[in-house]
């Protein structure tokens, strides 16, 4: 985290992710280790939260950002102030998405690759610029999609610009380029 603390962000059974300060854990202050909760937004139920997420420093804005996939879709928070996570963008009401899975930004934070993990579902690629420019708060239409085989499902992915490394249960490792996200 940009505050210098080493943090562990964990999924839990609830409408949020827990943030633990590992310095407190190492020093034996277990009661103080839970330092924040990142909510899933207004659309979440009390029972479910995030499935998967990515957190990292965004140098263009000086923010620590959290990208979470879970109940209802996907959420992006500014978590620079851990006590007051600021919801920046939601990706809800997306056709075919009731629960987000893996959700990963490009290094500049403009695009995200989103997964849902069910058969026939492609990876969806979204452009976040309309939200970050203040035009909208929610994005619900992908600009493109990718799949190795429409009859199978992709499982997880990782971005190492400009490539997306994708694992599939039946298709193994696949790699595609995000150099032109709309193609």
Give the residues covered by each predicted segment.
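Feature marking well-ordered beta-strand scaffolds used for ligand recognition
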Residues: 1-183
């Amino acid at each position: 985290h940009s505050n210098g603390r080493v943090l562990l962000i964990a999924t839990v059974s609830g409408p949020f992710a827990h943030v633990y300060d590992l310095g407190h854990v190492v020093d034996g202050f277990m009661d103080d280790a839970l330092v924040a909760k990142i909510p899933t937004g207004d659309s979440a139920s009390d029972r479910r939260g995030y499935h998967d997420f990515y957190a990292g420093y965004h140098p263009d804005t000086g923010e620590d950002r959290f990208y979470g996939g879970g109940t209802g879709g996907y959420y992006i928070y500014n978590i620079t102030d851990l006590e007051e996570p600021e919801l920046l963008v939601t990706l809800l009401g997306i056709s075919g998405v009731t629960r987000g899975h893996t959700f990963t930004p490009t290094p500049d934070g403009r695009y995200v690759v989103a997964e849902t993990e069910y058969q026939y579902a492609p990876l969806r690629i979204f452009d976040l610029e309309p939200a970050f420019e203040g035009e909208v708060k929610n994005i619900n239409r992908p600009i493109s999609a990718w799949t190795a085989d429409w009859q199978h499902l992709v499982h997880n992915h990782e971005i190492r610009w400009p490539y997306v490394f994708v694992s599939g249960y039946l298709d193994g490792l696949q790699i595609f380029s995000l150099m032109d996200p709309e193609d």
